[in-house]
Amino acid sequence: MRSNKRIFILFLSLALCSSFLSANYAFKKKVKDVCKSYRISMESNQLELETDAVSISMKSGRNNFEMFMLVGFASAGQAIAHQKQMGLSNAYIPGTIRVSVDVPVSKGEFNTFMATCKSDTAISLADGRLDSSEFMQEIMKTMEIL
């Protein structure tokens, strides 16, 4: 009888963990697919999913870090909108999005541009309700250069 309880608890915990992992997988897949459509390679290890924030790390070319910033925020916005649209109880919906872009300065040296925005702002960018120039002006207020 005791082993049956343990087996039941094990299966219950696996079921709960797998539903959370599938929400994470769907979120990461959506971000990767959007980045891929803009010819930006994205790996799962470049996404860090926290409880109420998602961090995206990217490496750009020398002169196009703005495009990487925009695509990073827009892809996260689309993934959040998709999670909301599915309406699942285990949906991953972070409140904050952080994007950091490494930009080469010289051989072997990088500047890191880091910006943060609320998920509603990123969804507005992804939906086209917010113009990209307006969005860049908004995130420039929080941008840090490391």
Residue spans of the language-model regions?
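Polar/charged, Gly/Pro-rich intrinsically disordered segments
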Residues: 26-62, 87-146
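Short, non-transmembrane amphipathic alpha-helical segments
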Residues: 66-88
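Boundary of Sec targeting at the N-terminus
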Residues: 21-25
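Bacterial N-terminal signal peptides
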Residues: 10-18
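Bacterial N-terminal signal peptides that target proteins for export
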Residues: 1-9
